[in-house]
Amino acid sequence: MWTFPDYIPGQLPDWQALERRFSWFADMKDVPQDPEWHAEGDVFTHTKMVCEALLQLPEFQALDEQEQHILFAAAMLHDVEKRSTTKSEIENGKERIVSPHHAKKGEHTARTLLYTELAAPFAVREAIAKLVRLHGLPLWAINKPNPERAVIAASLQVNTEHLAMLAKADVLGRICCDQQDILLRIDLFRELCEENACWGKARTFASDYGRYLY
């Protein structure tokens, strides 16, 4: 079984050990976030809060040990590339802090780190990388032009139940005024997946060709 270093299921992470071990984690310190969406502070603080929120979820605690290590790794890495994408811009006359495409870039970084530093086997590596890439989807799926297609397509790449857990922890691990509204969006994501037969599993198709066309 693959395990994430310095993490033991059922115990709080050793944050100091993780910071010493991983430069990419230490890099998150002092990377700013917009205070309207992340009043808790920098990316380092947020990442720790997300991981600790994840560990408290009953649905996370019900997973097997391998799945817990996969999700913990995804939580650690979900904002890894905010360090390289964060910038200030003016929006409607107000300065905002944004991190465009951090999830897309983070997927590639996560895959590389999991191969070079963490010796994750292929299936584990891809599961984590895709969780990083899609971690924001449960928050925005309902606003997509075609929400059904969005969740079905996601289910072909990632376990949507695990994705919802990561998104829930991401929301609980921040301080913002619209937290309950965002959590409702995650509930709607689950309903959308259930209605389209892709909650916690890949949507099945009548044939491989049908899946390819989709």
For each feature predicted by the language model, list its residue ranges.
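Exposed alpha-helical structural elements
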Residues: 3, 14-27, 49, 123, ...
